Design a protein with these regions (language model features):
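Conserved, structured core segments of small domains
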Residues: 1-96
Length: 96
């Protein structure tokens, strides 16, 4: 299994906002299943970043296309060579 970074641009309208709750349900499902490692949205730039665990780019495209918001998106997907974050590291040892 590989990690992929999806960079998604979107434009909003009234219908977009009505689809946010079912989209969040889908995102929570992906997070709970360990398919999605991280999810971030900037309303300022109307961009979303997702780090996704999948076997191929095609699988990532299929996952993205299942979102209720997918018709508002244009996106690029890149396979990651390195993925490091605070949450993937062991906790710091604290001596008493």
């Amino acid at each position: 299994m590989s990690k992929y970074q999806a960079i998604i641009s979107f434009e909003m309208d009234e219908e977009f906002m009505t689809l946010v709750p079912p989209h969040r349900t889908y995102i929570n499902y992906l997070l709970n299943k360990g398919i999605l490692d991280s999810y971030a949205v900037s309303m300022e730039s109307q961009t979303t970043w997702m780090t996704i665990n999948a076997n191929s780019k095609i699988e990532v495209f299929d996952l993205l296309d299942k979102s209720p918001l997918s018709k508002y998106w244009t996106y690029e997907v890149f396979e990651l060579f390195v993925y490091d974050s605070q949450s993937t590291r062991l906790p710091t040892v604290q001596l008493n």
